[in-house]
Structure formats: C-alpha cells, structure tokens
UniProtKB/Swiss-Prot annotation:
It comes from Bacillus subtilis (strain 168). The lineage of its organism: Bacteria, Bacillati, Bacillota, Bacilli, Bacillales. Disulfide bonds: none annotated. PANTHER family: MONOCARBOXYLIC ACID PERMEASE, SODIUM/PROLINE SYMPORTER-RELATED. One of its GO terms (cellular component) is plasma membrane. Induction: Negatively regulated by TnrA under nitrogen-limited conditions. This is Uncharacterized symporter YodF. The chain crosses the membrane at residues 5-25, 45-65, 77-97, 127-147, 161-181, 193-213, 239-259, 278-298, 325-345, 374-394, 396-416, 424-444, 450-470. Belongs to the sodium:solute symporter (SSF) (TC 2.A.21) family. PROSITE patterns: NA_SOLUT_SYMP_3.
C-alpha cells in the first residue's frame, strides 16, 4: 500500500526536531567531562525527570508494536505485560534504593561495577557485563525494526526505507555521543507526552470509527472471537507460561543495562522509591495498546502481518495529519530508547571489559572517550545484525529476558544476603544460562517460560554451593556499608 506524503513529512519534522533537541541538551561541556556525567548525568535528576527517562527507556516501539502483534495473534496472552510490570515495580521498591545508595557512594555506573565491588571479583563483573551487552544488542535491533516498519508503512513509494533508517540511527548515535544521557532524557519528555496523547486519542477514536463505540466493539469481539478474551489453560502459552513469564520478566526488568542507567541518574534514593510507586501509571498505556490489537484483529484482513497490525490500523483509519503524529510517536519510541540502551551497553563494555580486563590504568579522560565512542560500535552492530537477521530479533529478545534474569541473584539478592559468595554466584549464573539455552534449544520448557527453569537452577546452585565457600568470604566497603563491619574480616582480600 502506498504511503502518505503528509504523514511522512509530519513524521520527519517531529523526529528531526526531537533529534535537534537531543543535540542541544549536550551544549554544556560538563556532560562530557567524565563517565559519571555522560552516562548518569552526575546523578542529579529529580523524580519527574527520572519518571520520564525510565518510562521512555522501558516502554519502546517494540512494546507498542509487539503487544499489539501479540494481542492480534494470541488475544489475552498479551495481558502478561500488565502483572509483570506491576510486580517489577513492587520488587524494585525494595531493592533499587539500596542499589542506588551503593552506586552513589562508590561512584558505580553499571550493575557490573556493583558486582565487582560487592564480591571483589572482576570475573563476576565481566560475566555480568558480557551477558548485559550480548542480550542488549538484539533489543537495540528491535528498535531498528520498529522504525523500519514505521517508515515502510508511512513512506512506501517516497523514500528508500533502509537508507533513512541508517541515517536516523547515525543521528541518534551522534547526539548520544555528544550529549550523553541528557539527550534522551529531555527528548523523552516529548516522546512520553506524545505517547499518552496519541494512545488516548486512538483508544477513544478507533472504536467510534469502526464500531460506533466501545460497547459495540466489545460485543463484536465476544460474538466473533471469544477466544481472544481468554487465556488457554494449557499448551505452550497457557496459564503456567503466563505466570512464569510474568515472574521472570518482573525480576529481569531492572537487570537490563539501560534500566539501571535510568535509575542511577536519580538524585536521591527517595526519587528512586517514588518512581517505583508511580511508574505503574504507564500500564494504563499498555492496556490501551492491547485493546488496539483486538480492534486490529476485528478490522484488518486475516493475512495482515501481525508485526504491522498497529501501523496498518493507523493507516486505514486516519488521514495524513493523524497518521503523521502516530508514526512520529512510534518512531521516537524506537530512537530514544535506542540511545539509552547504547549508553548502557557502551558503559558495560568500556568500564567492565576494557578497563577491568584490558587497561586497568586507563585515565579517566581516555575512559570517557572510549565509553562515548563505543556508542557507534554498539549501534553499528545493532544495524548490521538487524539487516542480516531480521527474523531472529523477537526470538532473541525474548530469550534475552531469560538471560538477563540470571544476574538477579548477583545483583538484587546480594543486597540482602550478607554471606553470599562470589564462587557460588558465578557457578549459579553459568548454570542458569546453560539451563536456559538447553531448554530453549531442545524445546523442553513444558509450557513454562524458559528463563524460569534457568533461574531455578541458578538459585538452587547458589544455595547449595554457598556453604562450601562461605569460610573464604572476606569483607569490603560495599559489604560493610550494606550489613555493617565484620570482625576479623580481611578487607584486602581480592578475588578473580
């Protein structure tokens, strides 16, 4: 279907305006003086800025397009995103403020930094960093996929989609390199306001356009597709999958490097705590998005590509102006999270692989430059991977959730378990990753989310093996800050 020139022009104007704001956000040279300034804004962001930043970070184009696609094909299974995010914020309320305090005191900018200092182990920090980077690349690729799909629908017949996508991501890489976290933070405000306005507009107008209201729409859905409103009791995505997927996704949410980056920008633990209370408001948007998937199921032809369901629904329902604002919102929901993810991945690579393993005596100025420069490598890899393996992206991202949750014991559990040892934690992490991938490859999940099997193996290994190594456990400033000083501890003990 031919694109709409008016919609394409509006999309381009909004996106380019936001990119310019991203560059302007970094006009103050202080944003590039250190890794801490560039990646977490010197930890000076108030509660409202953090709310916009983390919201932009976690609710991406993949959230909107992916949830609509899931609702379009699987019905109510898509609602797993609601309990998982509510549960995630409930859990985060208890551990994120403690983690923020440790990061603030010891000037940590990544979760791998915390693992290194908490356990005196560069090995564990490197594992956390490797998992974080490898799992994040496909997630960045999905943002590429989101803007590519948007431009494909909006610009068919007018532009070379791949060329424009590449240019868009180069611009994002440039403003991220230049402005650091300040770029996506200030542009996130625009993106999030657009998300709320456009989604509310769509959820009110679409039922009126196609069914004369919500009640007739629900009645039509009940009559024509009642299976869309129930969760299967068994099968590969039955109730056990729904429950375990919600639990694993909740535990994994703040293990992602970009989520931790957003949290570490806060100016106080109280700001982090308040965000855990108010971030669930974004679930209102998620509920609306799922119902848009139901509307798409009723309105669009059966052979519609589920991935493009929301975009085609917009295309067939609105004129050029409304299409333009909707497409721009989805495009920004691709580009802005991509920037934050690139910062998170670059930080992990530069701090926890380059500095910790390759060049431990690197100067702060050079480390800052290396960290900033890695943005181009990360986004370049994501572009390359997305172009070469487009069909593997969703699978890899879903597997990424199962992989990321395996660092939960090393990060969140260790904030509360004083005698947790690095040896048991490393073995548990490796066991969890191995079990997750074996279950996935052999397709032996038995209706349970793959990451749940891995996390179970991980925790069992840590609990069983920890007593074997606890006598070797030392102390350090992080442990003393969390649990108080330990008598007879050897603070100079170093790990692998």
């Amino acid at each position: 279907m031919q694109g709409n020139l008016t919609a394409l022009l509006i999309t381009a104007i909004i996106v380019l305006t936001v990119v310019c704001i991203g560059f302007l956000a970094g006009r103050d040279k202080s944003s590039r003086t250190s890794v801490e300034e560039w990646s977490v804004g010197g930890r000076r962001f108030g509660g409202l800025l953090v709310w916009f930043l983390v919201g932009a970070d976690l609710y991406t184009a993949y959230t909107f397009l992916g949830l609509t696609s899931t609702a379009f094909t699987g019905g109510s299974v898509a609602f797993f995103a609601i309990p998982y995010s509510v549960l995630a914020y409930f859990i985060a309320y208890f551990f994120l403020p403690k983690l923020w305090k440790v990061a603030k005191i010891h000037k940590l900018t990544t979760l791998a930094d915390y693992a290194r200092e908490r356990f005196n182990s560069k090995l564990l920090a490197s594992l956390v960093a490797i998992v974080g980077v490898l799992m994040l690349i496909p997630y960045i690729c999905l943002q590429l996929s989101g803007i590519q799909d948007t431009l494909q629908v909006a610009g068919t017949g007018y532009i070379n989609v791949k060329f424009v996508v590449i240019i868009s991501f180069i611009l994002v890489a440039l403003y991220t390199f230049f402005s650091g976290i300040k770029g996506p933070t200030y542009t996130a405000i625009i993106k999030d306001i657009l998300v709320w306005v456009i989604m509310l507009f769509m959820v009110v107008s679409l039922p009126l356009i196609h069914f004369n209201g919500w009640t007739p729409m629900i009645d039509t859905l009940v009559k024509e597709a009642p299976q869309m409103l129930t969760i299967p009791s068994e099968g590969p995505k039955g109730i056990p999958w729904f429950i375990t997927a919600s639990i694993v996704s909740a535990l994994a949410l703040f293990m992602w490097a970009h989520a931790a980056t957003g949290v570490f920008t806060a100016k106080s633990a109280d700001a982090v705590r308040k965000n855990s209370m108010f971030l669930p408001l974004y679930n209102i948007v998620l509920i609306l998005v799922i119902f848009l998937g139901f509307i798409a199921f009723l309105v669009l032809p059966e052979d519609t590509n589920p991935r493009l369901a929301l975009l085609h629904l917009i295309q067939t329902s609105y004129g050029g102006v409304a299409q333009g604002f909707a497409y721009a919102t989805i495009a920004l929901a691709s580009l802005i999270p991509c920037s934050i993810m690139a910062i998170g991945a670059s930080n992990l690579f530069a701090n926890n692989l380059y500095r910790d393993l390759i060049h431990p005596n690197v100067s702060q100025s050079k480390l800052t430059l290396v960290t900033r420069s890695m943005v181009f490598v990360v986004i370049g890899l994501a572009l390359l991977f997305g172009m070469l393996f487009p069909t593997a992206l969703v699978t890899l991202q879903l597997l990424g959730v199962s992989g990321m949750v395996q660092i939960f014991p090393a990060i969140a559990v260790s904030l509360f378990w004083k005698n947790q040892t690095k040896e048991a934690t490393v073995i548990g992490l490796l066991a969890g990753l191995a079990v997750t991938f074996i279950v996935y490859i052999t397709q032996s999940a038995h209706g349970i989310y793959e990451g749940f099997w891995g996390l179970a193996a991980n925790m069992i290994a840590v609990v069983i093996l920890n007593p074997l190594f606890v006598k070797n456990a030392g102390s350090n400033p992080v442990i003393e800050g969390l649990f108080g000083k330990k008598q007879d501890a050897n603070p100079n003990q170093k790990g692998a």
